[in-house]
Amino acid sequence: MPDYKVYYFNVKALGEPLRFLLSYGNLPFDDVRITREEWPALKPTMPMGQMPVLEVDGKKVHQSVAMSRYLANQVGLAGADDWENLMIDTVVDTVNDFRLKIAIVAYEPDDMVKEKKMVTLNNEVIPFYLTKLNVIAKENNGHLVLGKPTWADVYFAGILDYLNYLTKTNLLENFPNLQEVVQKVLDNENVKAYIAKRPITEV
């Protein structure tokens, strides 16, 4: 079995889908949580000077979605063929587009600009994406694609706390089908065990 390490700050955010996937598949991994003080010295050792980073048998790789896709293949959550993988990728990329649209507003440094962008985000962007995804979940029996568990479900469940933090809301409050998607992931015994022992963090 490969030796896995996940390098990230002591937050959920983009690192949590990786931790969820490894946990889902019951693959042991070192959860290396870097402090802000440690980061400057470690930054040059990372492929692109950023995290999260996945290390597999001493080889470091970056890009959270690519790493998640790789882990999905290791834990049996990838598609059965190229078409199924395409279907999964379209959903994951949609979720990631949603994340980026939220992040652009959340990290806007100009308060006046941010206030205007928040109106569009809350009134248009968030309802659009969540309504679409909620319908997809209903059509797929409480999953995001293919009517069965895939890494799209785990990626979404893993990133959700971060999105709630950025928007300061409970995004899924009015979207029961998406709640079902997340709950199915959280009900996995291995994910449940990971959550029980992970550090408590705000984000």
UniProtKB/Swiss-Prot annotation:
Gene3D superfamilies: 1.20.1050.10, Glutaredoxin (3.40.30.10). GO terms for molecular function: glutathione transferase activity. Glutathione binds at Y8, W39, K43, G49, Q50, M51, Q63, S64. It comes from the Eukaryota. Coiled coil: none annotated. Residues 2-79 form the GST N-terminal domain. It catalyses: RX + glutathione = an S-substituted glutathione + a halide anion + H(+). Keywords: Transferase. Disulfide bonds: none annotated. CDD domains: GST_C_Sigma_like (cd03192), GST_N_Sigma_like (cd03039). Its EC number is 2.5.1.18. One of its GO terms (biological process) is glutathione metabolic process. Pfam families: GST_C_3 (PF14497), GST_N (PF02798). Residues 81-203 form the GST C-terminal domain. The keyword Transferase applies. Conjugation of reduced glutathione to a wide number of exogenous and endogenous hydrophobic electrophiles. Belongs to the GST superfamily. Sigma family. Homodimer. This is Glutathione S-transferase. It comes from Anopheles gambiae.
